[in-house]
Amino acid sequence: MPENRIARLLKKNKKLLIAYYMPEFPVPGATLPVLEALQKNGADLIELGIAYSDPIGDGPVIQDAAHTAIRNGMSVKKLLDLVRQARKGEGCRKITAPILLMGYCNPLIAYGGDCFLQDAASAGVDGLLLPDLPPEEADDFLERAKGFGLTVVFLVSPVTPPERIEYIDSLSTDFSYCLAVNATTGTAKLSDAGSEAAIDEYLRRVRRHTRKKFVVGFGIKDKARVGHMWELADGAVVGTALLQHIAGAGTPEETARLAGEFWQTLQ
């Protein structure tokens, strides 16, 4: 099976700027214009949230975005339909950036596990990040995902011991996703990790115990923070700050404009 877009991107050995977006937030019809704006303005990889009514690991901004998306008609099926349209260039310029879906297991189980993997791969999804999938119970899922050419990403946190970092690194298909602090998404503050020095030492520890690449997310809000994360990791994920910037938009066009303008400030 040929390499997917994520594997090809990582081979370029460049520092990555990764966007997290909740499809159909804040208004219906925003998804395709936002994807186009993010790609046009330099997003290397686009992470799409799977809207879920009980996103316990997410902060209030992403929880609110998920609830808004559901009210706007978002579902797993619609998400895959939107990815398919984006890949074909229907409703926007063709999206060629890698797409990673992030969400919880319950909606995927309700959809049908193997059916979801098959439909995600055929739609043009490149990988999955499921925070509530325990690595110790993931062997079967990993094999099935691999069969469909999908990357699977696991999480590392500041309290993950070295031997478990190595284990997670071995399981993640192409890269690991490193939480910058112990906090729900988008609520991170330096004080949560003790100090800037504590975060830096934590990321150096992750580097010592990983062989694959890793990216850092949760709480990254501006160009300075992106640059600092690039010094220590292989990529930075910006999500909550993006959602906050576009939250007041009233049309898909305004949403896309705001998304593009914000993304330019991170370069």
From Swiss-Prot:
It comes from Chlorobium phaeobacteroides (strain DSM 266 / SMG 266 / 2430). The alpha subunit is responsible for the aldol cleavage of indoleglycerol phosphate to indole and glyceraldehyde 3-phosphate. Pathway: Amino-acid biosynthesis; L-tryptophan biosynthesis; L-tryptophan from chorismate: step 5/5. InterPro entries: Aldolase_TIM, RibuloseP-bd_barrel, Trp_synthase_alpha_AS, Trp_synthase_suA. Its EC number is 4.2.1.20. Keywords: Amino-acid biosynthesis, Aromatic amino acid biosynthesis, Lyase, Tryptophan biosynthesis. It comes from the Bacteria. It is an enzyme of class 4 (lyase). This is Tryptophan synthase alpha chain.
